[in-house]
């Protein structure tokens, strides 16, 4: 069945993520911000968390939301394609009627269509263990490179001691 998130106030971090898992989003135009503030909190998002934003946002909006953590108000969210409309409960019901969403699940394939649309997102959830292993190997590699860099600097300082004149 179609799902709609009615955002009548702030949706930060996990609340924003939960809203993105809905098929449609309608936001209060006068109150509330959407914000993925993990960048400011120093909390990295795991791949499955990132995937829903990657799947549903334009590449530029995805980059800005993830790397800058802006607070996005209603009209900006609509302009960026994050939400599908602005308004309150009346507008949500109007949106449902306009799009004829009530009967869309009647054929029994609505869920299948969504599974196909978001196959990579589902794959990210199913492959979370591999995602964690990949992240761990990347971080281990960074540690090795950092140690090698420190060693090269120490070697250079040892060899160049007393040679530099300023």
Q: Which residues are covered by each model-predicted region?
A:
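Hydrophobic, secondary-structure "cap" segments at the distal end of domains
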Residues: 49-60
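Glycine-rich beta-to-alpha transition loops that act as phosphate-gripper elements at the mouths
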Residues: 6-11, 65-71
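Hydrophobic residues within well-ordered alpha-helices
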Residues: 19, 77-78
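Eukaryotic N-terminal low-complexity, Ser/Thr- and Lys/Arg-rich leader segments
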Residues: 129-166
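Well-ordered beta-strand positions
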Residues: 23-24, 64, 68-70, 82-88
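Glycine-rich beta-to-alpha active-site loop
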Residues: 1-41
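A conserved mid-domain beta-alpha-beta active-site/ligand-binding segment of alpha/beta enzyme cores
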Residues: 63, 76
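C-terminal long alpha-helix characteristic of the crotonase
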Residues: 27-28, 32, 78-131
């Amino acid at each position: 069945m179609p799902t709609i998130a009615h955002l009548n106030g702030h949706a930060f971090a996990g609340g924003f993520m939960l809203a993105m898992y809905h098929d449609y989003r309608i936001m209060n135009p006068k109150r509330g911000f959407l914000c993925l503030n993990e960048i400011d909190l120093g909390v990295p998002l795991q791949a499955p968390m990132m995937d829903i934003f990657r799947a549903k946002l334009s590449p530029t909006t995805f980059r800005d939301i993830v790397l800058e953590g802006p607070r996005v108000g209603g009209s900006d969210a609509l302009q960026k394609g994050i939400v599908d409309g602005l308004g309150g409960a009346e507008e949500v019901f109007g949106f449902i009627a306009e799009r004829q969403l009530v009967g869309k699940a009647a054929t029994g394939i609505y869920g299948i269509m969504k599974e196909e649309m978001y196959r990579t997102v589902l794959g990210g959830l199913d492959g979370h263990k591999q995602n964690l292993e990949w992240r761990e190997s990347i971080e281990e590699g960074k540690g090795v490179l950092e140690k090698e860099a420190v060693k090269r600097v120490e070697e250079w300082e040892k060899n160049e001691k007393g040679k530099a004149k300023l």
